[in-house]
């Protein structure tokens, strides 16, 4: 499983937790979801799920909370290809580079 510099283990996070976070995002909308969980909009990578685009770092942070009951804020882990985007990819999700709207490399 992927590791991040500040969060010791991502092992508790499963695809179902990511889908739960995405469902909450859909219910609340981007602005409310990000505000409620204290995240900003994605600057580099997006999660692609069911043809929808999500702020990858925010989704992973909320998925971690669904998995463990412990909230993570934006300063608790990194969001790049070696952080949130890499963790989501390791869980089998598609990640897109926000700059070119294509798959992340």
What are these regions (language model features)?
Residues 1-105:
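Intrinsically disordered, charged low-complexity linkers and terminal tails
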